[in-house]
Amino acid sequence: MNSKIIFLFLFSIAFSLQIGAQNNHISTPPEVSPMPMKAEMTEIWEPEVSVVTPAKTLGDAPSDAIILFDGTNLDQWVKQKDNAQPAPWKIVDNDHMEVVPGSGGISTKMKFGDCQIHIEFSAPDVVEGSSQGRGNSGLFLQNRYELQILDSYNNRTYRNGQAASIYKDHAPLVNAMRGPLEWNTYDVIYTAPRFKKDGRLDAKARITVLHNGVLVQNNVEISGNTYYIGLHDYPSAHGDDVLSLQDHGKKTQFRNIWVRPL
């Protein structure tokens, strides 16, 4: 009998201690570390965060952006297949540029890696054609990875080839295309691929895209170089490279293009 009483007594003490320990743990505020620290020990002051002045109008370039096209000239662009030649597209009303069908694509003079891009585009003034034949163009990141530009307003095509798709790789989450004669925007956050010293792929490129302010690509991996026929891949290592706009035989229009290297 005495041994049972002693056992029950010891058990009750152990149980009480366990409950007390749990209560003490629960009562510790989650925002206070149990380590003996002061608040300033986790404050980082240097280097001070750089100041960038945002644009007064949404979509305009912030103070640290590189202006690639402001409507007045094509000085930052060259012919895609011969960078010794000037960009062959035309400027309209000192406001926007227009593809000259058959003249070939254009590329930036500067090369980029990780970057933020803003670009505005409009389908041709005359709505004609269907599927891939309506207002087709493309923004090529590092001259390899295509963000599709297409008039996808009431225009059915394959889902991974419509506006805001990573062409034949990722369909957009939604179709956010505006109607005829309206301007569209792409805001892009691009992370370039990484390669090992021996040239092998270490990390694929990634991209986030907002189409007219709507999220359509959410930090997706780019499978590789864009091909019309065949599977995307990374055939060779590369560094920074140009941005290119495609001539697909349609009078697609562009304005207000800027980039922020990241």
Regions found by a protein language model. Give the residues of each.
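Carbohydrate-interacting regions of secretory-pathway proteins
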Residues: 22-262
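Sec/Tat signal peptide C-region and signal peptidase I cleavage site
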Residues: 17-21
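Bacterial N-terminal signal peptides that target proteins for export
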Residues: 1-7
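Bacterial N-terminal signal peptides
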Residues: 8-16
